[in-house]
A protein has these predicted regions:
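Short beta-edge/loop segments at beta->alpha junctions of small alpha/beta modules
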Residues: 1-48
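A short, charged helix-loop
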Residues: 88-90, 94-98
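Positively charged, aromatic-accented nucleic-acid-binding surfaces
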Residues: 44-47, 58-61, 120-126
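Generic structural signal for hydrophobic core residues of well-folded globular domains
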Residues: 46, 50, 66, 116-120
């Protein structure tokens, strides 16, 4: 109770800000106002446990980083191995995408490519054709070993994702 009181007092003073139950951050001041923490920090407990990845940011936030869209979103999608109910984290709404493959640091970039193909129609502010071209550009930059791994990971995805990946790989040679 004493710790809770102290934290509540610091939040009231404005020294720290609360993200979620038991999660706080110290806001940085700039000439443009208060900076919020990076998205990965807001959901860090959902992405890592004991230094091992248990989830990864996917959806619009990740697709913007990959250059597939220019939209910035307040909805975070996290790929995890088990189903979880959607939740709110500060001003973000967090939803979960069940990922049948093992989540490792090496797999995450490949899983993002497959998720982009899976969620092709849901990527905002861009056409599916542009997305396919963007994903093809990402796939073209992969090494031979990564291409084999990508094909293995695709086995657990829907048939249309495997078909689209096959068509892209065919077009790349």
């Amino acid at each position: 109770p004493a710790l809770v009181k102290a934290l509540s007092r610091l939040v009231a003073e404005g020294s720290i800000c609360k993200i979620a139950k038991g999660r706080y951050y110290k806001p940085k001041q700039t000439v443009f106002g208060t900076l919020k923490p990076p998205v990965a920090e807001v959901v860090k407990d959902l992405l890592e446990r004991n230094g091992k990845p248990i989830g990864y940011i996917t959806g619009t936030a990740a697709f913007a980083q990959l250059g597939l869209t220019t939209q910035i979103t307040s909805a975070i999608t996290i790929g995890t191995n088990k189903y979880r109910r959607p939740m709110k984290r500060g001003e973000y709404s967090v939803s979960f995408l069940v990922q049948p493959n093992a989540i490792t640091r090496e797999n995450i970039p490949l899983l993002l490519i497959l998720d982009a193909l899976k969620l092709l129609r849901e990527i905002p502010a861009t056409s599916p054709d542009d997305c396919v071209r963007g994903v093809a550009r990402l796939i073209a930059a992969l090494s031979e070993g990564d291409l084999e791994k990508l094909a293995d990971l695709a086995e657990n995805y829907q048939p249309y994702v495997r078909a689209l990946l096959g068509a892209i790989l065919d077009s790349l040679g």
